[in-house]
Every structure is written in C-alpha cells, then in structure tokens.
C-alpha cells in the first residue's frame, strides 16, 4: 500500500522539487497551499496530488480525509521586504505548530522539518525557525522528528529575490555593475537535486532513526561568496555572451552579526548513504543553462 506524504510549501522552490521526486518514488501526495498560491512550478503535477487550501479549508481536513504517514514541512517565511515580525512568526512558528498538533492528534508517523544552519539570533527568520525546532524536540516523544538543516541551496526555478538568481538576472541584463559585500563569507553552496536526495535518503532510512534526528545538509566543502559569484559570471559569459558587468565587492557592508563561516558537518548524512552528486561548477552549469532557455 502506498505511503502518504503531506507536503507543505509544495508551490515553492524546494517543495516543488520534492513533490516531483516523491511522486516518482510512488508516494501518494497531499499538499497544503493557499487559494492564491502561484502553482506555475507544479502545474503539470496538480492532477496527481490531493490539494487543500488552508486559507479557506480547515487544516485538519487533510488529516481526517487522508491517512497521513509522513509530513514534509518546507513552507516558510523568509522575512524579506520589511515584513512584520508577527507575519514571520505566524508562518514559521504558529502555522508550523498547528501542523505539528494535527500530526500528533492523528498519529502521523514522522515529521520532516526544514531548518537552517544560520545561527538562532542572526535575524527574525532564523530565530523563528530555531524556536520551532525546540518545540519539535519537546514533542519528539509523541512523533518521530527528522530535522534537516540546510545550507545555501540553489538551482533552476528559484525566486529571483534570492541571492543567486538575482545575481544571474543582473548578469543576464548586462547591468553596468553589481554592488556586493566583501564576498569573504564562506558558504557551502549545494545544488537543489542534492538537497532533495537528502530528504529521500532520510525517508528511506526512517526505521533506523531515533525519535529526534538532525542532519546538516551541505556538500562539506565551503567556498567564498566572491569565488562563487565569479564562477557565476564566468559561466554566464559563456552562456549569455560577453558580459561587461563589473562586480563591486565591498561596495555594501556585511549584515550585522553575519557569520563569516558556516560549519557543515554532514557525517551523519553520509553514513546513511547520501553523498552530493553535483560540484559547484556542475550545478552552476545546469542553473545558468536553464536561465538561457527561460523566457
């Protein structure tokens, strides 16, 4: 009998890739979205899923209609554009807690959570995410929890408001200059397919995991933001043609409290049999080639 996965954030970047991968693996998919959600990433998959609009339907309806075996929670609010703290907390903490309550009430087997490797007090987003993890740990005697802490993922179909797609969009427009920070920050850039594989790997090994498991999801190899952006520009010049855009590193200050190095320890994920398939160069080639054909 097919296992059923309830997926939140299915219309988003990560969620859309997870949705397609889980369907290919033969899982039954239930998704939570809003009536106003933009479904362009998953339009071709909508006929294969059961969908609930949580802004007009009770959240628990998905659980009373379906036997939910697993929840994969990718919905989040990044807190860009000067959003109110209450809006960020509503999505990242309160909405998440309502899903967790339903999981416990209806005996869902496992809650897969999407966390961040950012430090708790860096910003409102990271604080709200870490507060929810504390509740997950508190409730792990009632439901099995798998917490996946993601580093800087990238890939086709991400929002242009995010750093990597924004840089590519500026290069594609051949703007005169791009103002950046020093670029000395070290980050572990991981391609979206490798992130999805991490979720699938933990799902396939779920019986061997304890009541609360955490995994750092990164390649284990850090490079500077400056080096990464230069690689983006080099690949863009090959794909889009000669580019005269000047990269102005140091033109804007780093964010207050920003970590200069994010430590990724993916040992436990490697022990499950996971390993990244894409180098930075391979991932960027796929991403920028996609941007060439995108309208």
Explain the meaning of each model-derived region.
Residues 75, 112-116, 149-151, 184, ...:
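Active-site beta-alpha turn of Rossmann-fold NAD(P)-dependent dehydrogenases/reductases
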Residues 5-25:
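N-terminal Rossmann NAD(P)H-binding glycine-rich loop of SDR-like oxidoreductase domains
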Residues 32-36:
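N-terminal Rossmann-fold cofactor-binding loop
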Residues 89-93, 122-133, 158-165, 188-189:
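Short-chain dehydrogenase/reductase
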Residues 172-295:
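C-terminal substrate-binding subdomain of Rossmann-fold SDR/epimerase-dehydratase oxidoreductases
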Residues 52-91:
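NAD(P)H-binding glycine-rich loop region in Rossmannoid oxidoreductase-like domains
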Residues 115, 134-156:
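Conserved beta-loop-beta element that borders a ligand/cofactor-binding pocket
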Residues 73, 90, 94-130, 146:
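Conserved Rossmann-fold NAD(P)-dependent oxidoreductase catalytic core, especially the SDR/UDP-sugar
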């Amino acid at each position: 009998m097919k296992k059923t996965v309830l997926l939140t954030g299915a219309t988003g970047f990560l969620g859309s890739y997870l949705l397609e991968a889980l369907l290919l693996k033969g899982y039954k998919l239930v998704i939570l979205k809003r009536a106003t959600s933009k479904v362009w990433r998953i339009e071709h998959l909508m006929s294969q899923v059961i969908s609930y609009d949580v802004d007009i339907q009770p959240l628990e309806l998905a659980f009373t209609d379906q036997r939910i075996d697993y929840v994969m929670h990718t919905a989040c609010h990044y807190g860009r554009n000067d959003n109110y703290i209450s809006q960020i907390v509503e999505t990242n903490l309160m909405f998440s807690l309502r899903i967790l309550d339903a999981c416990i009430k209806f005996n869902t087997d496992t809650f897969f959570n999407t966390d961040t490797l950012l430090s708790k007090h860096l910003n409102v987003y990271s604080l709200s995410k870490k507060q929810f993890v504390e509740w997950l740990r508190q409730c792990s005697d009632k439901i099995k929890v798998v917490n996946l802490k993601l580093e800087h993922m990238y890939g086709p179909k991400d929002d242009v408001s995010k750093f990597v797609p924004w840089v590519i969009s500026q290069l594609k427009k051949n703007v005169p200059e791009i103002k950046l920070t020093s670029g000395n920050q070290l980050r572990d850039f991981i391609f979206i397919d490798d992130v999805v594989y991490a979720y699938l790997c933990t799902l396939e090994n779920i019986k061997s995991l304890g009541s609360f498991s955490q995994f750092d999801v990164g390649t284990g190899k850090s490079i500077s933001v400056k080096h990464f952006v230069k690689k983006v520009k080099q690949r863009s010049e090959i794909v889009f043609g000669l580019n005269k855009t000047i990269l102005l590193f140091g033109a804007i200050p780093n964010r207050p409290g920003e970590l200069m190095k994010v430590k990724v320890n993916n040992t436990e994920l490697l022990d499950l049999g996971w390993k990244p398939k894409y180098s930075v160069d391979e991932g960027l080639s796929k991403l920028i080639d996609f941007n060439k054909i995108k309208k």
